[in-house]
């Protein structure tokens, strides 16, 4: 009998799992809470009254949160942040490395806020791969991005390089946003990834060549002003703590928001 590939083994996931962009305020809130619980368990953050983990970048209109929905329960999530004048989350510690890509004229997007209810990469890997497939398709087909960037804990480096073909972008650093836990910057060159996967197992090749239908990719929930107020003003202090230049950028995008009330 032919030995199955490791990729085939990790991709054995039931048909009841639905990978898609969050479709409502409630699903976004569930996703933010799952990230909070996952990060709290890993000691990336301290406990907070809101029990939500989100940042200024979640308020940007181009940011997309993807979810793994298992019979109505969100069991995993990841967020994709396209580059903009507001920058990327990882600019906090990898500004030089990210700017070098920008200076080459490359279009960037960052993968962030990855969480699974199992809190362990080895067990979560099948669902993580399916989420990353949707991220990959959205980045290439909708954003027309050249690179996917991510900061990871060094202990997960093997997974990202073996299964997703990421390569190192920046060296080991402490990340203040996750209580100074260690981080590595990784990059996936979307322009060359199909060449890179040649010679790998068949399912890995399919991962990077099969395409999610465009109509499915574009289905996503856009936050209303009420949603923004709830998440970033009422439940958290995100807007009050955000740097002035980032709020100025968001104000230009959404002048209709009641900024005088939100940041008096």
Indicate where each model-derived feature is located.
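Charge-rich, low-complexity intrinsically disordered segments
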Residues: 113, 180-249
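Short acidic (Asp/Glu) patches
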Residues: 48-55, 59-62, 87-100
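Secondary-structure boundary elements
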Residues: 27, 41, 70-71, 137-146
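Short, His- and charge-rich active-site/binding loops that engage polyanionic ligands
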Residues: 67-102
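C-terminal non-catalytic accessory extensions
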Residues: 240-264
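Short amphipathic alpha-helix that is part of the acyltransferase structural core
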Residues: 5-57, 65-67, 74
